[in-house]
Amino acid sequence: MYRPDHASHTATTAHHDDRVQFLVVADESSLPELEAELALLPLCARGRVFVEVEHPEDVVPLSTPMRMTVTWLSRARRSGRPGTGDRCARGEAATRAVRAWTAEMLCEGPGETRAIVLGGFALVSEVQEHLVAEVGMAPTAVTAAS
């Protein structure tokens, strides 16, 4: 997938990494489904897992492939719209994290990215819309369930 904002990220040597990277996004309402999806990933899978929860105490151990990085996002420790004092709305922390991750990690190249999005309707619809409409991922590369 071509990203004009990443056009300057080329190197003089070829990068032959054609493995699939995974982006997995979930919230506390879908932890059982998240555990099942992570168990189905190949042992050599690589990528990022974002899990949004209400409080830091809601963090639980997850079994993931060795090359997957898990980031827990606590809404209680994040603000809503900057400068308003509003709390972080459900799905907002994960959506922000996905936007930042895609801006940094999705570059033109031989590799493929697949996304698995689980959770509440707002989270799933916003992340799916971002990945397909804004980033340009194929709809078939995004598995979404709310």
Roles of regions detected by a PLM:
Residues M1-S146:
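Extended, composition-driven regions rather than compact fold-specific motifs
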